[in-house]
Amino acid sequence: MFDIKDGKLKISVRTLVEFICKSGNIDNRFKGVTDKNAMDAGSKAHRRIQKSMGPDYRAEVPFKFTVPGENYDIEIEGRADGIFENDGYVTIDEIKGTYRDIRYITEPVYVHEAQAMCYAYFYSARENVDDMKIRLTYVSLDTADVKYFEEIMSAARLKEWFDGIITELRRWGDYLYTHHNERDKSIEGLKFPFDYRPGQRELAVNVYRAVSRGVNLFIQAPTGVGKTISTVFPAVMSIGKGISDKIFYLTAKTITRTAAQDAFAVLRNEGLDFKTVTITAKDKVCFLESETGPECNPAACPYAKGHNDRVNEAVYDIITHENVIDRVKVEEYAHKHNVCPFEFSLDISYWMDGVICD
């Protein structure tokens, strides 16, 4: 999702608000066009709206805003869809294409509104403007009909709101800053935990070289050679050197998943501070029994209803209390916070050092 490098936490406006301000249900009942088709149609709608606004309308206005901090600065970047004068107010326009019938959109989606509020705050802070107007422009991708929502906001209100967003973001940034420092220190003194078997050192060296160079490495070796630890160890070392950010270990069988978990456990016994999550298939981890598979919607599943209202707290709870997050831990915390265990595990993976995929 984001990382801290060279004393900076860099994040886009969209990622910021979609993370901090997300809410609502999981709902897989509404499936239509492919993501690419929707993106293409949305881009065309954006350009059409922007061109229709006249010569004084500035489209795709870039912003970069930095919030200094003690251990790291937060650098936020993005592009406002449009800026124009409206009834004497500088107005930030946020355009959203939708396949919903816009007649039934009675208020703006908070995440969309939050994007506009970020840009409004950036503008008011830079230009010393007392009051700003934000406009949410919803355009139907089927009919091209348009619906507007407008609101005037004071600079003081925008600042108070934005400060709250940054306070929440820093909670997560501080977690990363502290954990990554502790993890990297633990990697510095890490040694290979066994005496090398024939060919094992060569394997580990070649894995490290492949990771360092960003190339693929294909290995064929018999069972019992020690392939798992010989691949996990150099991958961990690459994280300590800043070459890699995260390890993904893909497994097809339970025994290989267990081998990966055991390899990380061995390194933890040697002093490694390293967080891992095991992702279990949705149909295995779903709390509801269904002959047709998981029904991920608020009408059928209480864990889907309001999932996005609760999942951030659930994630923060588990990542700050657990280093080894397996299926049992995922289910335990999912029950505690009343969230979908599968989607919960995916969100956890953003904050882990290693991800073991079932």
Residue ranges and their predicted role:
Residues Y208-R209, T228-I243, A263-L267:
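Walker A/P-loop NTP-binding motif
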Residues Y177-Q220:
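Conserved pre-motif I regulatory segment
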Residues F65-K159:
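Mg2+/Mn2+-dependent nuclease catalytic core
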Residues D184, I243-V355:
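A substrate-engagement module of RecA-like helicase motors
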Residues R157-G189:
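Polybasic (Lys/Arg-rich)
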Residues M1-Y89, Y110, A114:
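Metal-dependent nuclease catalytic cores that hydrolyze phosphodiester bonds in DNA/RNA
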Residues S212-P234, K246:
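Walker A/P-loop
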